[in-house]
From Swiss-Prot:
Record key words, sorted: Methylation, Ribonucleoprotein, Ribosomal protein, RNA-binding, rRNA-binding, tRNA-binding
Region (Disordered): 1-25
Record-level Gene Ontology MF annotations: rRNA binding; structural constituent of ribosome; tRNA binding
Name this protein carries in UniProt: Small ribosomal subunit protein uS12
Length: 124
C-alpha cells in the first residue's frame, strides 16, 4: 500500500481498455486485398468447413476475416471491405467481410436478412 506522498509523486496508472479489433484502428471498416482464400474447421463441438480469407489491409495489417453467407466469389487479389466482429467457433478470426461491397457479391436468392448479405430486393 503506497503512502499519500508516494501517490503524489507517481499517481496510479489507469488501465487501458483493450479493443476487440485492433487492426481497424478505431475505424468502422477498412479496405483490404485477399492474399489467400481458404476453409477452416471450427473448434469442438462444431463441425463444418468455414470460409475465411487472409486479408492485407490498407494500413499494412494482415488479418483473417470470415466470409458470411452461402457461396462467394472471392479469390486472391479481390478487394474487400472488412468490419469487426468475431466468429465464436473459429479461433483467431476477429473480422467479417462485408457482402455486397467492393469485389464481394451479395448472396444469391436471399429473401430475409438481405441487408446483412448485400442482396437487392427481389422484383415483385
Amino acid at each position: 500500500m503506497p503512502t499519500i506522498n508516494q501517490l503524489i509523486r507517481k499517481p496510479r496508472k489507469s488501465q487501458k481498455e483493450k479493443t476487440a479489433s485492433p487492426a481497424l484502428q478505431n475505424c468502422p471498416q477498412k479496405r483490404g486485398i485477399c492474399t489467400r482464400v481458404m476453409t477452416v474447421t471450427p473448434k469442438k463441438p462444431n463441425s463444418a468447413l468455414r470460409k475465411v480469407a487472409r486479408v492485407r489491409l490498407s494500413n499494412g495489417f494482415e488479418v483473417t476475416a470470415y466470409i458470411p453467407g452461402i457461396g462467394h466469389n472471392l479469390q486472391e487479389h479481390s478487394v474487400v471491405l472488412i468490419r469487426g466482429g468475431r466468429v465464436k467457433d473459429l479461433p483467431g478470426v476477429r473480422y467479417h467481410i462485408i457482402r455486397g461491397a467492393k469485389d464481394t457479391l451479395g448472396v444469391n436468392n436471399r429473401k430475409q436478412g438481405r441487408s446483412k448479405y448485400g442482396t437487392k430486393r427481389p422484383k415483385a
